[in-house]
């Protein structure tokens, strides 16, 4: 049986993401629903893809640093994801697929020869069915919020 909590890393050095060059990150600390890890990569990496687990899930990012400095923000210039971002004090993402990923545009950041991304997050696994229903609910809520904002703007 495959361990769901294994973190898989893909490095794009200009050739895209290749399954055969991906690897499972060693040394991931898991305590309860909290994961902490360091991802080491060289300055030739353009984009780093982090697959946090092999399950639909919710991630709350507690720490996310590059070479000891907080990542600039979680906008699309730096971070792309196949999850849905939920606003809050800490970045939170809902992934309704069993292949969740965060793509870090490290080429847009100041890199050294050797670099380290440090991540700490809390997670909750869920079935893809629950994830899909939650995603549809969030889509519905976001649509309703846009309608309310448009009504308020017109007044």
Predicted regions span which residues?
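Non-cytosolic beta-sandwich-type ligand-binding/adhesion modules
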Residues: 1-28, 73-83
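Extracellular carbohydrate recognition and processing domains
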Residues: 16-42, 83-98
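Noncatalytic modules at the cell exterior or secretory-pathway interfaces
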Residues: 41-50, 109-118
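Short beta-strand-plus-loop segments that form exposed binding edges in beta-rich domains
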Residues: 50-57
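Mature, function-bearing regions of proteins
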Residues: 84, 114-116, 122-130
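Boundary detector for helix-to-coil junctions that initiate low-complexity/charged tails
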Residues: 125-155
